[in-house]
Amino acid sequence: MNSERSERIKIPVLPLRDVVVYPHMVIPLFVGRKKSIHCIETSMNNDKKIMLIAQKEASKDEPSTNDLFNIGTISSILQMLKLPDGTVKVLVEGLQRACIKNIESNGEHLVAEVELIISPTVIDKEQEVLIRTTVNQFESYIKLNKKIPSEILNTLSQTKNAEKLADTIAAHMPLKLADKQSVLEIYNVNERLEFLMAIMETEIDLLKVEKRIRNRVKKQMEKSQREYYLNEQIKAIQKELGDMDEIPDENKILKRKIKSLKMPKEAKEKTESELQKLKMMSPMSAEATVVRSYIDWMIQVPWNIKTKIKKDIQEAKKILDIDHFGLEKVKERILEYLAVQSRTNKVKGPILCLIGPPGVGKTSLGKSIAKSTGRKYVRMALGGIRDEAEIRGHRRTYIGSMPGKLMQKMVKAKVKNPLFLLDEIDKMSCDIRVDPASALLEVLDPEQNINFNDHYLEVDYDLSDVMFVATSNSMNIPAPLLDRMEIIRLSGYTENEKLNIAKCYLYPKQMERNALKRNELIITDCAIISIIQYYTREAGVRSLEREISKICRKVVKLLILNKSLKKIEINSKNLKKFLGIKRFDYGKTNNLNQIGQVVGLAWTEVGGELLTIETACVSGKGKLTYTGSLGEVMQESIQAALTVVRSQAKKLGIKKDFHEKHDIHVHVPEGATPKDGPSAGIAMCTAIVSSLTKNPVKSNIAMTGEITLQGRVLTIGGLKEKLLAAHRGGVKTVLIPYENKRNLEEIPKNIIEGLTIYPVKNIEEVLKIALENTPYV
């Protein structure tokens, strides 16, 4: 800071709050503090000179010497006026910067010894450029900030005094106290101008943004006002023409609709209340749109509309038989359910949950139940739903809020008593943060769903007339939800059932879908059986339908390319041309009896599966290894099986210390697929015994059963699915736990007839049947 300092003078000090006075600046001040008034009176009685200096904190009424800045402005009092309330109004003019060297109080006011600051007057080309640039920038600022009078710009554009220019601009800028004081403390005028230019640049940018926002708001307001004005003009013109009666008031239409709906009292009061709000709002406001949307939803909800329910059980049976082949037990249970409903005239009762592998007809069964009862069919896919709001709706405070999917589907159905299918209920996403399954508890509980409350509608809705049916691939459903439903299991189809389904449903459906005439394509029974055996291996019929669809597409292409072709017959011999090489070896689980290899039977969400188990025994130190993505339960089964073998080593002719001198490796192929469960226990034990004794396992045998340490065989689940898997895989002999013998009565005869089934009580019986040679010595 280059400046010249003169001699020191003593002068009264007037502290200012949030005000910085610059040289060349004339400003009125209102003074109310007792010491400040005394300070002004002292100055008026002398040479009218006073030191004006800003307080660091405006909140302090009695500032000390440390509460004041060091640099201030010596000013002259031009005029003083005492006001009736005891305060004083003074008009002061800033003269020169000064620096406080010493300050003290004389008891009545502050007195300071100050040193005048004289900036060097050097005019060069740089300063001239700075003056011109600063004036131009200030002009841009004034154009955006209308609060500053344009006369000031006229005055400044003619001045050549850089000091006066800088201080005048600073006086008119809306600066913070710290920035105002910084301008005062910059002695070098060029630096002061640069500092002000930087501040003005920032202010100009802010003012431009402010102007853009203001213009946007103004345009929006003008648009709304224009639309309102035009609407009023149209109404006035229509009134003059006498057409106003033909255009009824929208609010009156809504009121009439609400009155005609026979809503429950709570819903009616809520809707009428919202309608009153709507009347008070501008039609163009955003809130009016939200309220109008809510009223529309309330009007669309089927509060009291019902379809007439059919009670003819014979007709229901006929519809189920036409739409679905087989599934006799399932149909019987559904008819029992419908019979009870027809007698009681109430829907209250257990919610049906159809559980089975993909493609067995769960969803289509729901459609058939709706058709047989005369109910409207509504389907809600729950797969992937992870938010409770998707079921219960969003509260209206959220932008774009809507009722939940449940109420949306009810609006779509337009009746209060549809059949509501909750599809894939086991596929809902649940974690520690979200649990949409909990929202379904109220829906599926007959005692609670009378008062279902959607967050958007905010009123109770009666779901007791709705017939809910759920579908799932597995029992992996939260326990409270499962407790509210009655389980009906749909197992996979047999080969004969698949053949009939293909002939009666899939083949005609794909013929129609691919625009084929009845005589253009013939698929023989042998061809369909070959597709089932060699191109699909599933519990349902989806893959079978895909293969038939593939044949139809290829036939359509051939008929178009070769006009001379009129008819194509697909049989087991030419099937390869249409579907390619065989994907599965039906009836060839193992061609030869092998050591250490056993076929187990497993149950999965997609039905039963054949599970190959391999065991190898090599010299080592007694290490047990298991591979193939095995779960904890299956690993424990292997350990239990090994303990059983050790306990019966003497009977089996195995050396007592085999577990110390041999490493045993158990592997279940298809290592990328996770596997778990206890039902492979006897298969593991058989594989280990076969490997240790070098006694081959019969190739046409499959087995299932949990093993205990005493060698007993415990009951298992999913027997029908497992026997179906054995049937599909061409297995001839199956070993099952003796306690599962009673379940054979529920399994269709056409499955059992193709299999030789041995119920076994212990591992001794298993080994005698499964191994090629008698294992016991």
From Swiss-Prot:
Tell me which CDD domains the record gives.
RecA-like_Lon
- Sequence similarity: Belongs to the peptidase S16 family.
- Report the EC code(s) recorded for this entry: 3.4.21.53
User: What biological process terms from GO does the record include?
Assistant: cellular response to heat; protein quality control for misfolded or incompletely synthesized proteins
The coding gene here is lon
Give the active-site positions: 679, 722
Compartment(s) where it occurs, according to its Swiss-Prot or TrEMBL record:
Cytoplasm
**Residues in Lon proteolytic domain copies:** 592-773
Which named protein is this?
A: Lon protease
**Top-level class of the enzyme under EC nomenclature:** hydrolase
